[in-house]
Curated annotation (Swiss-Prot):
Domain RRM: 93-170
Single GO biological process annotation from the record: nuclear-transcribed mRNA catabolic process, deadenylation-dependent decay
Disulphide bridges: none
Region (Disordered): 1-24, 169-218
Name this protein carries in UniProt: Embryonic polyadenylate-binding protein 2-B
Subunit structure as annotated in this protein's UniProt entry: Homodimer; Upon poly(A) binding, undergoes a dimer-monomer transition that removes the polyproline motif from the RNA recognition site and allows it to be replaced by the adenosine nucleotides of poly(A).
Matching SMART domains: RRM
Organism expressing this protein natively: Xenopus laevis
Gene: Pabpn1l-b
Annotated compartments: Cytoplasm
Amino acid sequence: MSERVSEEPGLDKGDRAEECELDDPELKAIRMRVREMEEEAERLKGLSGQDKSIGVSTRPCMQTTHSKMTAGAYTEGPPQPLSAEEKKEIDKRSVYVGNVDYGSTAQDLEAHFSSCGSINRITILCDKFSGHPKGYAYIEFAERNSVDAAVAMDETVFRGRTIKVLPKRTNMPGISSTDRGGFRGRPRGNRGNYQRGQRPRGRPFRGRGRPGPLNNPY
């Protein structure tokens, strides 16, 4: 006597195999894990694209430098090492900008100082531990006469703040390179080269005088 196998209408063997796979809890867990990993990768990709769009590096940095090599092109990274003469020449074409808003970018500063002349480099200093901006920047111009035009913008309002613009010096603004500190006056010592409250030992020397005439009673 032959056995009859009841089959549901409209389902073939492939459909039944797929239905069995969907009922497997381990397979469900694997698929959920893969889906979570894909979503996490998409989220990180979106954050990375956002950081690049605003010109902020995701790694901790001491300073964020935007160098304008060509029109509309910027590069990030620390400046290349320069000789002492090259640094002095660059400093003569640069200005210090203080009280800069922490959310400012190099593009914002370029737009504010674009009327002063062609800009070669904009450096926004960052804290080496947190990576957050310190609130001041340096702007290097292509020509020296642009420095005077930039200094004329001292105490102008930039992003709601009154900025301070000064010619850049080799050292920090307000600190003289020749000031070594310390007292340079002539020290005032005690007379006689002995401490207060002490007297020299022995009888004081009175010098030799000329003997006066002897009175002879005889």
